[in-house]
Amino acid sequence: MRTVEVEDVEFIYSMRQNEQKTKYLSKVTGSIESQKEWIKSYKLKEEQREEFYFVLESKKKEKLGLVRLYDFRKDSFCWGSWLIKDNAPKTTAIESALQVYEFGFYTLGFDKSHFDVRKGNDKVIAFHKRFGAKIIKKDDINYYFNFEKSDYEIIKEKYRRYLNE
C-alpha cells in the first residue's frame, strides 16, 4: 500500500468509473484531467496528515485497488472508497484491511475506526463483521460501524500471516 501519485490517475479513474465496483460509492464525475487536479489537491491533505489515499499493490508493484483514510476525529479515523480489481488475488481484501488498520492505529495513533457501508453491500458488511467490527447505528442508506484498536490487536493474531512485516 502506497499513497497515490498523479501518475496513478488513469488507474484511479478507470476504477472509479467501473459502475459494478462503485455501485455503493459516491459517483465520480468529470474527466481524467479533473481527476488529476483532484489528486493534486488531495496530496496537500496528505502533507497536512488530514487524509490519505492509497493504491493497493502486489509485491511486484501491480496495482490491485484503492482505499482512503479520512474524517479524522480526536481518537478515530474513517476508511472507505475501498475498491479492489476483479482479478486481484483473493487475499487482497484481508491484506489491505490489515494495512489500513496498521496505518490508522500505529502510524497515525488512533484508538478506533469508524466507517459506514451501504445497505445491500452484503459482501463488505459480512467482511467487516467477520473482522470484528460492530454495527452501532443504521439508517435508510447505511450501516455505521466502529472497530476498536483493542479488537484489532486480537484479530490481528488470526490474520498475522497476511501482514507484510
Task: Describe each PLM feature range.
Residues 71-80, 110-111, 141-143:
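A conserved beta-turn-beta hairpin within the catalytic core of GNAT-like acetyltransferases
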Residues 57, 81-92, 118:
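A short, internal acetyl-CoA/4′-phosphopantetheine-binding micro-motif in the GNAT/acyltransferase core
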Residues 139-165:
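C-terminal "cap" of GNAT-fold acetyltransferases
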Residues 90-104, 126-130:
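Conserved acetyl-CoA-binding loop-helix of GNAT-fold acetyltransferases
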Residues 114-125:
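Conserved beta-strand-loop-alpha-helix junction that forms the acyl-donor binding cleft
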Residues 1-14:
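A short beta-loop-alpha structural element at the N-terminal edge
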Residues 20-40:
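Conserved GNAT-fold acetyl-CoA-binding loop/helix
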Residues 33-76:
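Acetyl-CoA-dependent GNAT
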